[in-house]
Amino acid sequence: MTTNPKPAYRRILLKLSGEALMGDEGFGIDPKVLDRMAQEIKELVEMGIQVGLVIGGGNLFRGAGLAEAGMNRVVGDQMGMLATVMNGLAMRDALHRAFVNTRLMSAIDLAGVCERYNWANAISLLKSGRVVIFSAGTGNPFFTTDSAACLRGIEIEADAVLKATKVDGVYSEDPAKNPEAELYSELSYDEVLDKELKVMDLAAFTLARDHNIPIRVFNMNKPGALKSVIMGNTEGTVISHKKRTET
C-alpha cells in the first residue's frame, strides 16, 4: 500500500447507499452503523476535509420496484426522494450527536424540515467546515441518487465522488459468483464502458466522465477504508480519464 503524508482530496462528495445503513437489519436503519459512519466522517472533518454527502433510499423504499408492480413511476420516485430525506435526517442527527456541525438540504421544498438546496449556500457551508447532506436526489423522477451524487459533486467542485459500497471496489465480475474475479485498482471511464462494468447507472457515470470528476469505489464496511481513500492510498478502485497500468 502506498502512503501519502497529506490528504489527496480537499473537498469530496461521499455517496452512501441506503442499504449500507441497514447493517444486518434487513430493513430501515441500524443505529450502530449510522454512528460508526458518523465517526468516520467526523475524522475527515477534523483533518480539514470538506464533506458533501448523498445517501440513497433503498433501505426504506424503492420506486422502480413498485413501478414494475403497476405504480406510476413518477409517484414511486417521489416517494423514493422522501426516503432519502428520512435517511438524511437520521445521518444529520448522528453527526450532531458526534458534535459535527451539519446542514441538511433538499432538492424539493420541505419547509420546517430542512432547507431547499442552494448551490452558493452549500459552498459557503462547506468552506466553513460544516458537513452538507444533499437529499431528495436531483428533485426529478427517473434520476438515481448516483446521478444526484455526481451532479452535486460537480456543482460543489468536489475533487472526487467517493462511492461507498459493500465490496472492496470494482471487479471484473461479480465476486459473489466468481471468487477469482479481478479487483481493479484503477480504470479509465472508457474501460468501464467497454467492459460493461457495473459502477453506477449510465446517466450518472457519463455525467462524471464528461465533467472529468474522478470516482473512487471502496468498501465502507472496512474499518479505516474511507480515511485510506482520502489519504490517496491504493484503496478500492479509482476511475478517471487515466488509462489503467497493465501489470
Swiss-Prot record:
Its main location: cytoplasm. Homohexamer. Pfam families: AA_kinase (PF00696). CDD domains: AAK_UMPK-PyrH-Ec. Catalyzes the reversible phosphorylation of UMP to UDP. It is an enzyme of class 2 (transferase). InterPro entries: AceGlu_kinase-like_sf, Asp/Glu/Uridylate_kinase, Uridylate_kinase, Uridylate_kinase_bac. Keywords: Allosteric enzyme, ATP-binding, Cytoplasm, Kinase, Nucleotide-binding, Pyrimidine biosynthesis, Transferase. One of its GO terms (cellular component) is cytosol. Allosterically activated by GTP. Inhibited by UTP. ATP binds at residues 15-18, 58, 62, 165, 171, 174. Transmembrane segments: none annotated. Residues 23-28 are annotated as: Involved in allosteric activation by GTP. Belongs to the UMP kinase family. This is Uridylate kinase. It is found in: Cytoplasm. The keyword Metal-binding does not apply. UMP binds at residues 57, 77, 138-145. It catalyses: UMP + ATP = UDP + ADP.
